[in-house]
Amino acid sequence: MDGLWVKCKQCQQILLTKELEKNLKVCRCGYHFRMTAQERIVMLVDENSFIEWDRELVSKDPLQFPGYAQKIQKCQIETSMSEAITTGQGRICDIPVVLGVMDPRFIMASMGAVVGEKIVRAAERALKLRLPLVLFSASGGARMQEGVLSLMQMARTSAALTRLSKAGLPFFSVLTDPTTGGVTASFAMLGDLIIAEPGALIGFTGPRVIEQTIRQKLPEGFQRSEFLQKHGMVDIIIERPKMREQLAALLALHCGNSLEGVES
């Protein structure tokens, strides 16, 4: 977050950036600003417990899409990430987990071949290690610059999570602002427990497109996490300052048997 001050989009108050960051980027009015993947990992996992996987995987621009290679390179420099998701193993309140966190700064965390591959590998390692999988989604959907290779990741990630489910290992999906498009239509909505942050935009396509298509005015708060929880699409909404402790409690509740005998 650049600058000394930042304006809240909800209450319009001017906030001191350092104070906002101390409060995990949550305004006094409850508005949740977007976080980077690194900020979220630091917030969640026990100190020095996170080991990143597959950082060497990078997109090779398979379709030679104009400007795509330059955009990838620019995002890598600006974010210090190799791709739009960081995956690895860590501990949350001493509970071992496989963790994946998307970062919307990287081409809006769109899902291409590398993002899909990293999620599949994370699920496969969770299966091998007998650990729960936790994925934090924040995405604009499938990455158009990779065409059908991007769309394939919807099926690949879903298949990997099905194998995890058949093995009796839990997958917690945490939806943050925004979670849309092909990510919503695939792995993000397949969690054994679907968690969301307050006020997160969650849907397949944008509300303006829907209104233009059906020629009707959408209900207030449509596609926000509170609306989805009310209509059975989200199981629980957790405020960011409470995320670590409540996630640990839910993991302990759901993972007691599956974690027996796991080496830390």
UniProtKB/Swiss-Prot annotation:
Gene3D superfamilies documented for this protein: 2-enoyl-CoA Hydratase, Chain A, domain 1
Zinc finger (C4-type): 8-29
MF GO annotations: acetyl-CoA carboxylase activity; ATP binding; carboxyl- or carbamoyltransferase activity; zinc ion binding
One GO location term (cellular component): acetyl-CoA carboxylase complex
Cofactor(s) needed: Zn(2+)
PROSITE patterns, alphabetized: COA_CT_NTER (PS50980)
Cellular compartment(s): Cytoplasm
Main location class: cytoplasm
Reaction(s) catalysed by this chain's protein: N(6)-carboxybiotinyl-L-lysyl-[protein] + acetyl-CoA = N(6)-biotinyl-L-lysyl-[protein] + malonyl-CoA
Enzyme Commission number(s) of this protein: 2.1.3.15
Annotated pathway: Lipid metabolism; malonyl-CoA biosynthesis; malonyl-CoA from acetyl-CoA: step 1/1
Keywords per UniProt: ATP-binding, Cytoplasm, Fatty acid biosynthesis, Fatty acid metabolism, Lipid biosynthesis, Lipid metabolism, Metal-binding, Nucleotide-binding, Transferase, Zinc, Zinc-finger
Domain CoA carboxyltransferase N-terminal: start-end pairs: 4-264
Keyword flag Transferase: yes
GO terms, biological process: fatty acid biosynthetic process; malonyl-CoA biosynthetic process
Cofactor binding summary note: Binds 1 zinc ion per subunit.
Amino acids binding Zn(2+): C8, C11, C27, C29
NCBIfam families the UniProt entry points to: accD
PANTHER family hit by this protein: ACETYL-COENZYME A CARBOXYLASE CARBOXYL TRANSFERASE SUBUNIT BETA, CHLOROPLASTIC (PTHR42995:SF5)
Subunit structure: Acetyl-CoA carboxylase is a heterohexamer composed of biotin carboxyl carrier protein (AccB), biotin carboxylase (AccC) and two subunits each of ACCase subunit alpha (AccA) and ACCase subunit beta (AccD).
Function text: Component of the acetyl coenzyme A carboxylase (ACC) complex. Biotin carboxylase (BC) catalyzes the carboxylation of biotin on its carrier protein (BCCP) and then the CO(2) group is transferred by the transcarboxylase to acetyl-CoA to form malonyl-CoA.
UniProt family annotation: Belongs to the AccD/PCCB family.
Protein name per the record: Acetyl-coenzyme A carboxylase carboxyl transferase subunit beta
Native organism: Heliobacterium modesticaldum (strain ATCC 51547 / Ice1)
Gene name in the database record: accD
